[in-house]
Amino acid sequence: LVKLGGKDDKNAVVLAAHMDTLGGMVCQIMDNGHLKLTNIGGMNPNNAEAENCKVYTKSGKVYDATFQLENASVHVNGEYSDTKRTYETMEAILDEPVKNKEDVKKLGIMTGDFVCFDPRTVVTESGYIKSRFLDDKFSTAILLGYAKYLKEKEIQTERTIYVLITSYEEVGHGGCAAIPDGVTEMISVDMGCVGKGLECDETMVSICAKDSMGPYDYQVVSGLIKAAQENDIAFAVDVLSLIHI
C-alpha cells in the first residue's frame, strides 16, 4: 500500500491491482517418479497441456519439467483424444533421470513445492503482447506508471490517492484489510473479459456492473462511465456472471 498524496485525506480513493498469478503445486510424488499437481488459483489443466514448467524446491533449486497427460503418446494411447484433462489424469514429468519416488526426493523435491508454467511471452512487430498470466500484471504496471507520472509531473490530486498491490486475488483472500481510514472509494483495475454475450472487445475499457456475487457500487460504476464518456474513452459495461472479482 502506497500513498501517492492528494489534498483530501477524508475523501480518499484506493486504486488496486493484484500481482499474484496462476500456477501449480506438487501434491503427490508417484511411485514412478512422476508428479501430481494441484492448481494454484484457476489454472485450468486444459490450458497447460504439454507445457514446459519449473519446479521450485524449498532448498532453492529449480528443476525443469513438462505437464502432460498420463500415457501421453498418441501412438500407444487409444483413449488420448477422449480423455478428459484434469489434475487427476495429468502429471508433471521431470527432465531428470528419475525412475521412482526415492530418486525424486533425492533431488530435494517434495509435496508443497510450487510449479510455474512457461508464460510464452511474445511481443509482435505490430506492438501486440501475447502471453499467459497477464492477469493482473498489466494492471499492476499501469498503476505503477500512473504513480511515476504523478511524481515526475509533481501533480497534487484533489483527492488523496492510495495504490494497493495485493498478492492474494487468485486464491480469494482479497485486499480489504489494507484499506486506510478516510477512503470512500476503491477501484480495482483488472483484466477485462471478451467473449460471447459481452459488449467489450480488446480495445475497450471494461466496466463491470455485476459479477457472480452481486452488483457493484452504483456510484463508482456511474462515475467510471461518466469519466469515460467525458474523455472519449471507448468502454463497455458488462455483467461477468462466471467470476468473482
Regions found by a protein language model. Name each.
Residues 1-243:
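N-terminal hydrophobic/helix-forming segments and targeting peptides
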